[in-house]
Amino acid sequence: MFQLDNLLGGRTTVTFDQSHRLRELVADWQLLSDLSFADLILWVPIRKDIKLWPTGHIAVAHIRPTTSSTVFINDVIGNEVTWGARPNIDEALSSGDIMRNTEPERIGDLLIKEETIPVFFEGQVIAVISRHRNAEHMRSPGKLELNYREIANHLYQMVSEGNFPYQSAGSLFEPVPRVGDGLIRLDVNGAISFASPNAKSAFSRMGWRGELEGRNLGEVAEQVV
């Protein structure tokens, strides 16, 4: 977090509360990266005064997924881009909308799809997340991949609305969870709509012998505790 604070203090007009919010996001965003099989870069607008239009953006944080290979071999933290050089980042900051309909771009040997997500806090967009995925890995997703991505998209929508992570609650996850260890998805009634293979194995080791999907998680937990 020391590097994050240094970058924010030197090139941006981010306030103390905004900086705290970005630290909360970075503390929990491994989950976002893993669920979307993507590298994430956090961009903050560069400007000398809050009343001035940004001259560009600076990358203040970067996370690589544990569920897929990275698309960035070199460190990108501290990189700067001028306004207009990355229109999708500009647009997410200006409009507050998630920018998804972008054409893949070739970077080295990889065809990379970029999406940008505004980070909303107290009535304004304070930063932008750029999400970078290998387009080749997106062509034939299975049930697990589709569920991961759908969950990720819900969480990114919450980020754009200022609802994830929960404010001033500390990190939700201690230690930081690995999606690959097992994931369960619930519907609004608490019923399991999807359980990854590792999640099923974990419940099996606890003594559960039936199907998980379609069952109420609370009822399942009561039977294995």
Feature map (PLM): residue ranges:
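Sensory modules in modular signal-transduction proteins
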Residues: 21-41, 160-195, 199
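A short beta-strand signature within small-molecule sensing/ligand-binding domains used
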Residues: 108-118
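Extracytoplasmic/periplasmic sensory segments of membrane signal-transduction proteins
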Residues: 11-66
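Glycine-biased flexible loop/turn sites that connect beta-strands or occur in inter-domain linkers
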Residues: 123-124
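Sensory coupling linkers of modular signal transduction proteins
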Residues: 129-169
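Soluble sensory domains of the PAS superfamily and closely related sensory modules
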Residues: 24, 33-35, 83-99, 155, ...
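PAS-family sensory domains
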Residues: 10, 45-46, 52-85, 144-152, ...
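Extracellular/periplasmic ligand-binding regions of membrane signal-transduction receptors
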Residues: 1-17, 153-160
